[in-house]
Amino acid sequence: MINSSISSKLTFIIDYQPIVETLNIGVVGSCATLGCWQEPVAMQRVGIRRWRVDVDYGSLPDSFEFKFVVFDPSTSHINLWEDGDNRIFSKRSDEASGRYKAVFRGTLDWHGAGVAVPVFSLRRRNGWGVGEFTDLCLLADWCVATHQKIIQILPVNDTNISFDDTDSYPYRSVSIYALNPIYVNIDKIGEIKDTNLLREFEQERRRLDEQHRVQYSDVLRLKLSVLRQLYREQRADAALYDTLRRTLFSFEQRNGWLLPYAVFRCLADDFGTGNFYAWGDWASADETKIRRYATDNAEKVEFYYFVQYHLFKQFREAKSYLNAHSIYLKGDIPVGVGRLSVDVWQYPHLFNTDKQAGAPPDDFSDQGQNWGFPTYNWANMSKDAYSWWRQRFSFMQTLFDAIRIDHILGFFRIWEIPLTVSSGLLGYFSPALPLSVEEIRQYKLPVDEKYILRYSDGKELIVTDTDNVLFIEDPYKPAHYHPRIMARKTQAYKGLTSDEQEVFDRLYNDYFYRRHNEFWQQSALNKLPVILDDIDMLVCGEDLGMVPASVPDVMRQLNILSLEVLRMPKEMGTEFVVPDRVPYNSVVTTGTHDTSTLRMWWSEDRDRVRR
């Protein structure tokens, strides 16, 4: 993309893979300002993969050729010229905005080893029964000693809505911004002055630290109790509180999400439930009411500012430590948000709250998956150029160097299940091109009411309800139908004649594997380029499962790394991924958060692993 400007400078921005610290990205070209093809102009690193440089616009000729290069700044020796023809810039033909942004063409074959681990597993001696953000520094020391470059963690957002062990699921966030209090290091905040309470808290801390497994709800309960006491004591100290109050006010001013999150948390405390549908007049968020509540309940609201302030302070200090030791931190963006979340409460128009996301059946789950998240209303999101998503990624960029997009297939299409249904078997892809009655008849198949499942009556359905149906009516387009997933296993299919079965198989295969290729490709291209436009993180997509044929091309086009799991090869007829066959722009791993760990896998399947 070329943009120029009748301004004092022209800014070059290039995205490229990580490179070794001794090398630099530069721009070199046919004019003196760009080194006459000999002396590259050094660019400055502004992210894990983004580089930029400003050059004097007036010193550039009306037209010139150039390329981006990798070079050694100490000698100006060019190690790598980008592929393809020279880039051409013309002041006469190019639009004005002072910016030229592109992706480097070619590769230097940089590789980086790393480790994926949940933060809760990083337990240190004399801890609180769970890993904490500060423990990432200890892991970084180990990575340095073992020559690793990347630490990948599971999502660390606040997930606490029921305050029991179900809240430990890291992919159902209460807020896409707030961090989970379970990861705070209490010792870094201060010490309880009340000796009786201190003794009581210390006794419980030791008990939890001695447990072999994380006692999630007990640890969270203890930490929140200690945090409340610390806040009360610090608030009671006039001199200390004056500084604290100003610090928290500044933190709130820099984070627009914090006020509604804190009020949401307080209302959940007030009503004794995080189910905001049971909050009466508060069932829907209102900015004026939120601000009034915060004014009337300043101390309660400020407590949640206090918690989040220390969480972010500790997280950023840990990340700074990692980066200072040349370790990149990779985060994880879940495919959905919790149904009972601040985001759904504030922006219900962005979600289909009568639907839920999941995944179709596969070799690992014959019933499919139902994650329970509301699906996204992409039509409404597109009205402001996906600002909710753009803000989400921009915020993640302040925390991480690289990001994993969980279930990137959801940007192409999502497996959608009505709220009245529990099984993933009863879903359909959305968006989709459901079949009309005429199209089904063209296959010489009977359009019999007994073979059709309708959701329009709103009654709750169970798996056996679908055993005698071949089609599911589309909820958005009446009289249009999706073939029922895994239809060959139904009694309805077995009741067809052999000729009808053969015809249905053709319809089914065309529908799921060919019909939507271009449609889903365009669906993703409508969203992802806009959402990722200003992101300089290294982006990886979790492209596992029932993958549309268009996914790899879109990911290559957008420079998104694929995920290759050693024990889950994408190539048919192979038992394991062959590393030298995977694309360069990929992350190769021995497993995911849904599989056993490397050590467990080695122990549980020794004969297969040894092959």
Segments predicted by a language model, with ranges:
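Aromatic-rich carbohydrate-binding modules that target alpha-glucans
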Residues: 16-61, 71-94, 128
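A short, amphipathic beta-strand motif
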Residues: 10-15
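Exposed beta-strand face motif in extracellular beta-rich ectodomains
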Residues: 62-66
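Short, conserved beta-strand segments within well-ordered enzyme catalytic domains
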Residues: 26, 67-69, 152
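Short, loop-centered acidic/histidine patches that primarily coordinate divalent metals
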Residues: 69-71, 408
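Catalytic cores of glycan-processing enzymes that make or break glycosidic bonds
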Residues: 1-5, 55-56, 90-611
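Secondary-structure boundary/capping motif
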Residues: 7-9, 44, 323
